[in-house]
């Protein structure tokens, strides 16, 4: 993963983007008390999910709640005679990157599966299902044949050199695809994971749709496995650095959970030698996601998965303070800090794993795990995860929320095109490439559209945050930061 941080920096430099937008919701609620801050987790969850409506591409539905957005990119794929409308803009730009979009959909689906009752209890399950479906529908359209998958819409270089609203952008909508001749196992397998996870979400409420999702997932997994080749050879942005074995295990784990078919478990057992001990969970590295899912199977009696369970424990040991094998340090203020490029993506995903892993231990009446001479109970793991959520919501040295629209102090200059340029509804005149840069990107004013729920890249290793639109490493939100946070905030609505 040595090249990972370099890639992120180069990518974000070229993107010069930031998400933000005005939604019709109240400000985040934070009540003071003599003790620690008492955060309104239900409100934070609602806003974390609402963020995805501000990232939508395509024809917006009548139920759209983020009112500063309008229809956009309605001709995506038209020149190739394929309908690639819909899906999500990745971060602060107007490009649809399929791989991180699929990962975000996987995480949202995992949250819906793991915390269905908690999310439903605060009336957010329907909104979450809509967010999942928006991503899944795009992936279904992008899978046009058993061995053809569209993976990106938009010219990253051209888009990142401009600063335009998605509603009137005029940069090329170039499409990219993988097939048997130019494979991308990582992406095909991630699409498979996302669709199989989503199939579980919809199984009880739309059986036909769930079946369609699972069918495409199986086909995509076969494509990924039988036409192995790294996406690093077929991608312009979001290239793979960790290889494709993690995605194959991740997809097989979800397919086993969704279908119950023993062939997927056999595949995992036969290939569990691929499993590695890791210290991050990200759009590029899914090992601990698969390991966590399969740890549940181990405790359920699948003892052949012992190596994978041990590898999952190694991740916990790598991030827990006080662990003898700790690899990820915390800032002076207590935030897990993996690297200084959109660090909160790693914090939210690690926190998600910590919460779910602790829940698995409780469900299976396991006392805890050992990290050398250190022992951590499920309660201790959950307790540390909670500190990460609280840090993001405001319990930090900057005394600010890193979620836009939550609390009284939060980022106002999100690195996000649509948020930083007046809505087309109030400023219908076209904002061109250079005008966007000079008039809005370089502006010292707050973004005119408050992108409620957007979580930015976060502070530096010393807990400092510069609220500047140009600081893409810290001021830009992404779909996968929010997707992981949905599970983490949902966990705090649960008792264990």
Curated annotation (Swiss-Prot):
In the record, biological process GO terms are: cellulose catabolic process; fruit ripening
User: What EC number(s) does this enzyme carry?
Assistant: 3.2.1.4
Active site (catalytic residues): 93, 415, 467, 476
What are the entry keywords?
Carbohydrate metabolism, Cellulose degradation, Fruit ripening, Glycosidase, Hydrolase, Polysaccharide degradation, Signal
Catalytic activity from the UniProt record: Endohydrolysis of (1->4)-beta-D-glucosidic linkages in cellulose, lichenin and cereal beta-D-glucans
MF (Gene Ontology)? cellulase activity
InterPro entries attached to this UniProt entry: 6-hairpin_glycosidase_sf, 6hp_glycosidase-like_sf, Glyco_hydro_9, Glyco_hydro_9_Asp/Glu_AS, Glyco_hydro_9_His_AS
In the UniProt record, the signal sequence range is 1-23
Q: What does this protein do?
A: Involved in ripening fruit process.
Protein family (similarity comment): Belongs to the glycosyl hydrolase 9 (cellulase E) family.
Name it: Endoglucanase
